[in-house]
Amino acid sequence: MSLKYALYPGCAAKGATPELYQSTMAIIGRLGIEVVELQAASCCGAGVISEADPEVALALNARTFAQAEQAGLDVMTICGTCQGVMGAANKRLKDPETRERINRMLAPEGIVYGGAVQVKHLLWIVVREVGLHRVREQIRVPLSDFRIAPFYGCYILRPSWDLGFDDPENPTSLEKIIRAVGGESVAYAGRTKCCGFPIILEKEAIAVAMAGQNMKEAKEEGADFMVTPCPLCHMSLDIYQDRAGQAVRTPLNLPILHLPQLLGLAMGIPAKELGLSRHLVSVDSIVRTVEKRRDSELRTKNL
């Protein structure tokens, strides 16, 4: 059975982190997910536009939702920040008066949003709609050699009344996926904290210290690498990792994977197809371990 969604990749996956888009497209077919990409979608606003003009932010997202609604599909996001912003906007657009007001703004484009669309992150879809049993069926190289730190960030968890999927204080969805791919999930205090990205342009020293503290805690608990469902978290943790390590006076060297890269590695998809060479913090040691295990299992099967 195929699950079909309107794919909203967001800006980061088509710009600064194309490996997120690449790895998403590499895994979804194996999970029975079919997508129609929203080619004319707007930026979600990332919480910035709503600060300047909440009505414009709602209109931008209603415009995107209307495209999915016209196709008869729910929206699939692959960015935790997009999920948080769009989930909040969609909840407000369920109110008929709000929706009518925003539709008047969209009228010159001939666009009307009826409020029927749901917005779902890939993480939620995999856990709840694909099912962990199907994930386990697709595993070719169990990641049993690794202790993996989940990092949720803010927007995919809070505010819970706009999102409503995972417990904002004690989420479990990433941990379930880590176990499904054969890894050991690392428990640490920073997994639900902010990555620092929202303030990185204004207060870089504070932002990198926040990121550094989260990674330091994960390393202290024995994490081999970290996985996140948000590309903005990924940028904060990967691109700024050297400065983050300096801020907390700890050499980190902690690889950061996108969620679909984690799934793809365990499915036996080659590293090149997952865009793993794009990371600033090298993931080569992880790839070598996975490839060695994959080759060993292939030799065993051929005996």
Q: Predicted regions span which residues?
A:
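Iron-sulfur cluster-binding electron-transfer modules in prokaryotic oxidoreductases
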Residues: M1-L303
